[in-house]
């Protein structure tokens, strides 16, 4: 019996260790899930992986807050039980922040009649049921727009509809039953516009499995150019809503506003009487927004939005709503001047830098940062530089390009110093950009240079201008 206490101690130690090990495994699993979720849907760069395990790390807390806010959760910045539960839910595979492909500008079809083709079928549903649900899903969008659709049975359609499993040729493999249900691509040639459905799911016509009509209507919204909505009642909300049966597949006002901002309302029926009415006065900024001669003082991104500055105002544009808001600069940042010269965002620092004359300011969200304004010469400019015409931050290289008349400088954001060997001639390294610049910014890997009422889309890898557009083309004018 002398060994009994030892055996009891061993038993206590083993029994006590088990729940601790299990808890540690659960936490590791949640951390892996968080990293995967943020990388897939919230544009978490691979260089940020090292911070994921440090849950109190500033950048990771901000990403968790961003996710919680987007999905309508309580914003805590912590990996709480509600957040973990949501990350386990079935959803669309299209990112909530960031995008599958690099495409410039605002994605929309340039025509109103589109073709679609059902390339193959799931074994879960009869073929005529799939045909009927795809037709119904397109009809939902057709009823509120000028768009019409016709089916083709061979060749390349605008929208190719496919069932697939795991790796299926687009570098975004499915993950088996649950989690990612489907994904779709924005309007454009090739694979763009196509919708892919995970055939490992159990597709149904009712709510007993994954309702195909509900998911198809959502994915085809992406095929028409819509992004995810933060409105939990919207069809374009990213999470699969198990409470919505086939009878409840309908558009919210948020969905209607989004799609009509791209294509407008449906044409009036010739048989419908039109009641005379007094014309409504235009909203502030509307006429100026679509003025063909419109130019901008400065442009910058801000947490996924784009800010277009003009005089003492700015337009605030998001990729989810596509309808720009119009505000006085002072309503968000009272100390900022009007008539801004240049602006750019350093995403890794969550800061936007605003330039006017020989001074610059820093803002974070709607907060102005202490210690500003500072002189532009603290960045390393020579005394001869009196003002900045435009600036672009290259996220991939972590460099900022400053454009002054016909020259440019490059600033290393990591080292916080101007690089040697500058200035250089703009025309030499940016062929085709030979006008004096008013504004510039980066979007989806392209640089956009603005001069007067024109903008030049520039591919920095190919070093060439790819499109010349009106400056206000971002406003869907």
Curated annotation (Swiss-Prot):
SMART domains: HX, ZnMc. Zn(2+) 1 binds at residues 168, 170, 183, 196. It catalyses: Preferential cleavage where P1', P2' and P3' are hydrophobic residues. Ca(2+) 4 binds at residues 297, 389, 438. Hemopexin repeats lie at residues 287-336, 337-383, 385-433, 434-477. Glycans are attached at residue 120. It holds the Pfam family PG_binding_1. Ca(2+) 3 binds at residues 175-176, 178, 180, 198, 201. One of its GO terms (biological process) is proteolysis. Ca(2+) 1 binds at residues 124, 199, 201. Ca(2+) 2 binds at residues 158, 190, 192, 194. The keyword Signal applies. Binds 4 Ca(2+) ions per subunit. A motif (Cysteine switch) lies at residues 90-97. Residues 18-99 form a propeptide. Its main location: secreted. Its cofactor is Ca(2+); Zn(2+). Gene3D superfamilies: Collagenase (Catalytic Domain), Hemopexin-like domain. GO terms for molecular function: metalloendopeptidase activity; peptidase activity; zinc ion binding. InterPro entries: Hemopexin-like_dom (IPR000585), Hemopexin-like_dom_sf (IPR036375), Hemopexin-like_repeat (IPR018487), Hemopexin_CS (IPR018486), M10A_MMP (IPR033739), MetalloPept_cat_dom_sf (IPR024079), Pept_M10_metallopeptidase (IPR001818), Pept_M10A (IPR021190). One of its GO terms (cellular component) is extracellular matrix. The conserved cysteine present in the cysteine-switch motif binds the catalytic zinc ion, thus inhibiting the enzyme. The dissociation of the cysteine from the zinc ion upon the activation-peptide release activates the enzyme. Belongs to the peptidase M10A family. Metalloproteinase with a rather broad substrate specificity that can degrade fibronectin, laminin, gelatins of type I, III, IV, and V; collagens III, IV, X, and IX, and cartilage proteoglycans. Activates different molecules including growth factors, plasminogen or other matrix metalloproteinases such as MMP9. Once released into the extracellular matrix (ECM), the inactive pro-enzyme is activated by the plasmin cascade signaling pathway. Also acts intracellularly. This is Stromelysin-1. It comes from Equus caballus (Horse).
């Amino acid at each position: 019996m002398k060994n009994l206490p030892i055996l009891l101690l061993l038993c206590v130690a083993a029994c006590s260790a088990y729940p601790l090990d299990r808890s540690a495994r659960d936490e590791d699993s949640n951390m892996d899930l968080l990293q995967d979720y943020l990388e897939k849907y919230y544009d978490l760069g691979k260089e940020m992986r090292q911070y994921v395990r440090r849950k109190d790390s500033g950048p990771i807390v901000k990403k968790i807050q961003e996710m919680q806010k987007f999905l309508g959760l309580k914003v805590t910045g912590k990996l709480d039980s509600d957040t973990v539960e949501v990350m386990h839910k079935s959803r669309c595979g299209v990112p909530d922040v960031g995008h599958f492909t690099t495409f410039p500008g605002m994605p929309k079809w340039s025509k109103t009649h589109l073709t679609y083709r059902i390339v193959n079928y799931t074994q879960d549903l009869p073929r005529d049921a799939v045909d009927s649900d795809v037709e119904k899903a397109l009809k939902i969008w057709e009823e509120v727009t000028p768009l019409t659709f016709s089916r083709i049975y061979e060749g390349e359609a605008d929208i190719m509809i496919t069932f697939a499993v795991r790796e299926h040729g687009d570098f975004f493999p499915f993950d088996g039953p649950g989690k990612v249900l489907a994904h779709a691509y924005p309007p454009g040639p090739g694979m763009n516009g196509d919708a892919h459905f995970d055939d490992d799911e159990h597709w149904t016509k009712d709510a007993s499995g994954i309702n195909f009509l509900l998911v198809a209507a959502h994915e085809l919204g992406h095929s028409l150019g819509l992004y995810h909505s933060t409105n939990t009642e919207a069809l374009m909300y990213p999470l699969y809503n198990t409470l919505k049966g086939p009878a409840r597949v309908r558009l919210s006002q948020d969905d209607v506003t989004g799609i009509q901002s791209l294509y407008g309302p449906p044409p009036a029926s010739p048989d419908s009487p039109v009641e005379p009415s007094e014309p409504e006065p235009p909203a502030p900024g509307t006429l100026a927004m679509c003025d063909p001669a419109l130019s901008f003082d400065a442009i910058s991104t801000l947490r996924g939005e784009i800010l277009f500055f003009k005089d003492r105002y700015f337009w605030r544009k998001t990729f989810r709503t596509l309808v720009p808001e119009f505000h006085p600069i002072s309503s968000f940042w009272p100390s900022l001047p009007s008539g801004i010269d240049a602006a750019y965002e350093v995403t890794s620092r969550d800061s936007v830098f605003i330039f006017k004359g020989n001074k610059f300011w820093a803002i974070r969200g709607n907060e102005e940062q202490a210690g500003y304004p500072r002189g532009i010469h603290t960045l390393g400019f020579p005394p001869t530089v009196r003002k900045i015409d435009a600036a672009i931050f290259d996220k991939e290289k972590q460099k900022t390009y400053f454009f002054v008349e016909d020259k440019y400088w490059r600033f290393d954001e990591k080292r916080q110093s101007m690089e040697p060997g500058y200035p250089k001639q703009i025309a030499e390294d940016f062929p085709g950009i030979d006008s004096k610049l008013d504004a510039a910014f980066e979007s989806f890997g392209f640089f956009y240079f603005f001069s007067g009422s024109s903008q030049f889309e520039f591919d920095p890898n190919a070093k060439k201008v790819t499109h010349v557009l009106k400056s206000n083309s971002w406003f869907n004018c």
